[in-house]
Design a protein with these regions (language model features):
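N-terminal secretory signal peptides and thylakoid transit peptides that target proteins
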Residues: 2-18
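Structured, non-membrane catalytic/scaffold regions adjacent to prosthetic-group chemistry
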Residues: 29-356
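Hydrophobic alpha-helical membrane-insertion segments, chiefly the h-region
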Residues: 21-29
Length: 356
């Protein structure tokens, strides 16, 4: 398990640099020469049949240092096993749906783009995310719903998971139930109003609200096989991670930063909280052992994170700050400290600051 974790940590650490740091060790000239062969700008996004409702005015707070509500594409985290970003031409892209279905099918990119398109805001999260970490991002995704395609294929009784494969053969396994339960599970072609960036799955990727990316966020997807959990263990499941991966209720302090030296007086503590497909009901901030209710920004959808803030009357001295959230089902974030394996880290994000 250690070797696999080391590899995962390496890939996570590459982040938005798209593994450029590894170029010297794996053929930097090859990485640079092939990375931009396909130009996503040639794709023209189809207008969605129904546009999302406008964001509530108070959804995005204007607090310096707070994560923006929408994560810019260039800053969106990247975690995958591709040391060289795949170059997939829309003209040659196809998606095969097969396995435990009555009507196996193959769909081309042109056929996909003729299907009804929607836009939906979804916060994606990596299971490798440590408490308080940065491998989470929110975007407006454009695509077609996956469920109607699967209904057309005719899912057979007993099918439990969809094994999704990318152009390089990497596989992820997502449970059938959450994909078919009415949530906006997408074959996405757009991100924040632009065609998918290459590093985030161009021309087509999967985005399923409420599940960690290692089971749901297949980039460069070209194959979906309906099967059972007993018949196949996907890549990360073989390495000790859970088959089902609902995202846990979590929260993070964005400002102030850990170790900050702050002036006495009114200090704004702010951050984000998330419980995708359940939504955030409340956030509390702990200062030196006492809990205080934070103010929440507006909720976009239950599939996105929610900004929050608390104005703290800071007094001189060292202080410890913590945060916890409660989701809309009434379940609070757990205080139990646990690492990411096998299904996501837990505990309260905690930082130390000093007030002069």
């Amino acid at each position: 398990m250690t070797a696999y974790l080391d590899r995962r940590k390496f890939l996570v650490a590459c982040g938005v640099t798209s593994v450029a740091a590894a170029a010297a060790g794996v053929g930097g000239e090859l990485l640079i020469s092939k990375r931009f062969r396909v130009n996503p700008s040639v794709v023209k996004l189809t207008p969605p049949v129904v546009k999302p409702r406008p964001l509530p005015k108070d959804t995005a707070l204007n607090i310096p240092g707070l994560s923006p509500f929408y994560t810019p594409n260039a800053e969106f985290y990247r975690v995958d096993t591709s040391l060289i970003v795949p170059q997939v031409s829309p003209a040659s892209w196809q998606l095969r749906i097969h396995g435990m279905v009555d009507n196996p099918m193959t769909i081309t990119f042109d056929e996909l783009m003729k299907l009804p398109m929607i836009e939906h805001d979804v916060t994606l999260t990596c299971v490798s995310e440590a408490v308080g970490g940065g491998y989470i991002g929110n975007a407006r995704w454009q695509g077609t719903l996956l469920a109607p395609l699967l209904r057309k294929a005719g899912i057979q009784p007993g099918a439990q998971q969809i094994v999704m494969r990318d152009v390089n053969g990497m596989n992820l396994g997502v449970a059938v139930d959450p994909v078919m339960d009415g949530r906006a599970s997408l074959l996405a072609v757009g991100m924040n109003g632009q065609p998918l960036p290459q590093a985030h799955g161009f021309p087509v990727r999967v985005a399923v609200p409420g599940l960690y990316g290692y089971v749901s966020a297949c980039k460069w997807v070209v194959d979906m096989e309906l099967t059972t959990f007993g018949a196949f263990n996907a890549y990360w499941v073989q390495r000790g991670w859970s088959q089902r991966a609902p995202i846990k209720t979590e929260s993070r302090i964005d400002v102030p930063k850990a170790g900050s030296s702050l002036p006495a007086g009114r200090v704004t503590i702010a951050g984000v909280a998330w419980a995708q497909h359940r939504g955030i009901e409340a956030v509390e901030v702990n200062v030196d052992g006492s809990w205080y209710e934070a103010k929440l920004a507006g909720q976009d959808t239950i599939d996105t994170w929610r900004q929050w803030y608390y104005v703290w009357p800071a007094t001189p001295g060292p202080h410890t700050l913590k945060v916890r959230a409660t989701d809309k089902t009434g379940h609070p974030q757990t205080a139990l400290v646990h690492g990411p394996e096998p299904n996501g880290a837990t505990g309260y994000h905690t930082i130390a600051v000093t007030v002069a």
